[in-house]
Regions:
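Structural core segment of the AMP-binding/adenylate-forming
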Residues: 10, 51, 78-156, 482
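Conserved ATP-binding/catalytic segment of the ANL
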Residues: 377, 384, 391-451
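Conserved AMP-binding/adenylate-forming core of the ANL superfamily
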Residues: 3, 22-52, 57-66, 70-74, ...
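AMP-binding/adenylate-forming catalytic core of the ANL superfamily
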Residues: 90, 107, 401, 406-407, ...
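Conserved C-terminal "lid"/linker of ANL adenylate-forming enzymes
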Residues: 449, 474-476, 482, 513-554
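Conserved AMP-binding/adenylation subdomain of ANL enzymes
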Residues: 202-219, 226-313, 322
Length: 554
């Protein structure tokens, strides 16, 4: 599918148009204007050129979110090379494997990651460059080392009469050219490299421009890892082409850091995973109304509306009080928290997608979102549910269109397993679609639990209810010997703060189990529970690695 516009042209135009505006800020650290970004892009181009990098070569980036991470990304993509973003949470052997599998010729790396890497395990690299100052601790090329030592001098010779907007002219891409190889967080073995062409990036960015409405000078806080396409697309790529001021928290945000930074920055759009929203609402908002008086007043006409408005204002303030909408994605959203947000008319929306679609498949503006859905299929995409009755009987959701990947890098067999002969991507998610086109995700196909009586059980639906019960931090539902077992990581700090002993906590969890079973049909009731002392291990997008918890001991 050919798109008339050019993604590289959008980057170039944004830099030229917003030359004197703030572009990138490390929270409590450096700020770069768009003109500073342009200068650093040119300097990185000098390093790439002297390292012998050619168009189409792979360049890996591994580090925490930062201004220099995004500058490096922009430099690589405007040079015509292929970006290989690597999640900073990956272990050293995973980083080594991805660098080698992708055939990356350079690795840009954060200092905390670099400390744990072994350059000998990545023998094909021309060099390793530090993100913080673009130093070159490892160079297998004399020209690269010389270029770094004389970078300002070379830049001065290249632009002797002051660097100006007119000096910027990036080569435009071809729609099907490979832009990114994004290695999925993957829960088994080494992850697969998703090949995203410029077509996919451009289509995703254009969709955001059409639906979200950021303007030059708006502020956006980047919380999601830029190595994952959700944060990369919604925060960074869309934001930069719109001329926004992008702030990086540079570390995993706690509710305290979020409240502090959002109050100062007052972002216009917030993209985050459900876990962040759920924690804030369960800790700061729901306790104020989750009592007999609160529930009573919420059902009294006139008073109810005023209370809802007060709650909404309080919730808005937690996120800075200036945003158009909060875009939630990356994992299932707690149904009871969502129902509460809907009740107070809070401006949230659900986005659904996959790395393989860069990532957008479904999304609707918050004013159009139907409760429990993830919106409608995005522009330039089509989707269907493989079911005899898609509105009533869940089936696998498949999609195709402009956002779709080229395939998995050097893995044709894996590509054939997910993209059929008609070009449909099999998402692995069970869903229904109503008559208005709203998509409802029921759970992962691979997570579906099938009992001996033939009943299909979606564990995510039960977990959503259980996670909202007293002192439950997170949970997993598994099937053992044809019985459902609830694995629970309790909120022990909260329980002990309320004077509960360990035996009290066990008693409360049993009460939770009995109360939950009253809300469930007989075939999906929990037979027993098991408490876990530590939170469940997760992927980068905060999905629990379920495969680790399928074989539990008494």
């Amino acid at each position: 599918m050919e798109l008339e516009q050019s993604f590289i042209a959008l980057i170039e135009q944004s830099i030229k148009t917003n030359w004197y505006l703030n572009a990138l800020t490390d929270y409590k650290g450096i700020t770069l204007q768009y003109r500073d970004v342009a200068r650093k892009i040119e300097k990185i181009h000098i390093l790439l050129e002297n390292a012998g990098i050619e168009k189409g070569d792979k360049i890996a980036i591994c580090g925490r979110n930062s201004a220099h991470w995004t500058v490096t990304y922009l430099a690589v993509i405007t040079y015509g090379a292929v970006v290989v973003p690597i999640l900073h949470e990956f272990k050293a052997d995973q980083v080594h494997n991805i660098v080698n599998h992708s055939e990356a010729r350079l690795l840009f790396v954060g200092d905390q990651i670099w400390e744990n890497l072994n350059e000998a395990a990545m023998p094909h690299l021309e060099g390793i460059i530090e993100l913080k100052d673009f130093g070159v601790p490892v160079s297998r090329s004399e020209k690269l080392a010389y270029a770094r030592d004389h970078l300002n001098e070379i830049f001065g010779h290249k632009f002797p009469c002051r660097f100006r907007p007119d000096d910027i002219s990036y080569e435009k891409e071809k729609s099907e050219d490979l832009a990114i190889i994004n290695y999925t967080s993957g829960t088994t073995g080494y992850s697969k490299g998703v090949m995203l062409p410029y077509r996919s990036i451009l289509s995703n960015v254009l969709y955001c421009k059409e639906k979200i409405g950021l303007k030059a000078g708006d502020s956006v806080v980047s919380m999601l890892p830029l190595g994952h396409v959700f944060g990369m697309t919604f925060d960074f790529l869309y934001g930069f082409t719109a001329g926004v001021h992008l702030w990086f928290l540079t570390r995993m945000p706690s509710p305290k850091i979020i409240a502090e930074s959002f109050a100062e920055i007052r972002p216009r759009v917030i993209a985050c995973v459900p876990l962040i929203v759920e924690k804030i609402f369960k800790k700061n908002i729901l306790p104020k109304v989750d009592n007999k008086l609160g529930k009573l007043l919420l059902h009294v006409p006139i008073i109810s509306d005023k209370i809802k408005e007060l709650i909404k204002q309080k919730a808005m303030e937690v996120f800075g009080g200036n945003f158009i909408e909060i875009i939630i994605g990356g994992a299932p959203f707690n149904a009871e928290v969502e129902a509460f947000l809907k009740m107070i008319d809070f401006p949230y929306t659900i986005a659904y997608g996959m790395t393989e679609c860069g990532p957008i498949i479904c999304h609707s503006h918050w004013t159009e979102l139907k409760l429990a859905s993830c919106g409608k299929v995005a522009a330039r995409m089509e989707a269907k549910v493989l079911s005899p009755n898609p509105s009533a009987i869940a089936g696998e959701l498949v999609c195709r269109g402009a956002n779709l990947m080229l395939g998995y890098y050097k893995n044709e067999e894996a590509t054939r397993q997910v993209i059929d002969t008609e070009g449909w991507l099999h998402t692995g998610d069970m869903a229904t679609i109503d008559e208005d086109g709203n998509v409802f995700i029921k759970g992962r196909c691979k997570n579906l639990l099938l009992t001996s009586s033939g009943q299909n059980i979606y564990p995510e639906e039960i977990e959503s209810k259980l996670n909202n019960m007293p002192y439950v931090s997170e949970s997993l539902i598994i099937l053992q010997q044809d019985k459902l077992v609830g694995l629970i990581y309790p909120d022990s700090d909260d329980a002990f703060a309320h004077g509960l002993s360990q035996s009290d906590l066990v008693r409360v969890m049993e009460e939770n189990r009995l109360e939950l079973n009253k809300q469930l049909p007989a075939f999906s009731q929990i037979a027993r529970f098991k408490l876990y002392p530590e939170e469940f291990e997760k992927t980068a997008k905060k999905s629990i690695k379920r495969f680790l918890y399928q074989d539990i001991k008494e």
